[in-house]
């Protein structure tokens, strides 16, 4: 099973709590995180894109770096780990993304890929005057289909004459082209999102579900597997989890309860309000899960709370789910979390037993 790190491109990572570590996103922090992840044989690193935060006491995600420029920098200071940036497709023409991706492919030596997102939080785009109207919610995957067609043209042949409802290319050129086939990843959980991923993505991210219920996402992975069977493609699921680990189950649980007790209710109210704006994509979207009050303090990603041995056992359970090819991990404290994962958790995981011994110093 592949292991990735979801780097904290926004302040405070993924805990919306006054009791969680409070920090700003910087290149130096993310450099240390990704170099440490590479040392411990993580397979990939991904950064999101967020253009406006949730506010509140913690100013959650009010402070964010930009994904492509951050990952270009990280590509230059790593050598093996795969690097993925996220394109907010309403903000960037596909021809520009194609050229930026080809550039980072050159920087990384073929280790780069692109995560495509349609956008769900209206204020991110309204503040710039580029929100296309609420009809976009029902047409966003039509838009993304044209977008990826242009990308594929330019990466494949260096030229596009695509004509569609959203994009018109007229002998559009990109050169040099990527040195290897460019991977495209997505995070669709709605029916439309999964259908798109089944046609165009190399793999699809989905949320884990619940606390210490590592296989509860299985129905989502099964839906993705079924959608991919309809297209004859192999599109695996990569599952998002937060790891909160300590020496004992009780110590880890105490940390989790402490974070929940400090939940930033003002920021969470903003998230809930924004999740209700899209009335056209159904009830199974990512943002609907993020705003579920059950565990909104960490946007309802699957949460693995326990001793190092308990977390290792639960991750091995994840690997048994059909269609699950990897996990994307966040941590309450990224630097110590990755080190503890590499030293205390990963060596206990049967699904990672194939890894070579650690031989180099952490940067």
From Swiss-Prot:
Say which species the protein is native to: Escherichia coli (strain SMS-3-5 / SECEC)
One MF annotation (Gene Ontology) recorded for this entry: uracil oxygenase activity
The organism sits in which domain of life?
Bacteria
Gene encoding this chain?
Answer: rutA
What's this protein's family per the entry? Answer: Belongs to the NtaA/SnaA/DszA monooxygenase family. RutA subfamily.
What is the induction note for this entry? Up-regulated by the nitrogen regulatory protein C (NtrC also called GlnG) and repressed by RutR.
Keyword Transferase included in the entry's annotation: no
Instruction: Please state what the protein is called.
Output: Pyrimidine monooxygenase RutA
GO process annotations (BP)? alkanesulfonate catabolic process; nitrogen utilization; uracil catabolic process
EC number(s) from the headed UniProt entry = 1.14.99.46
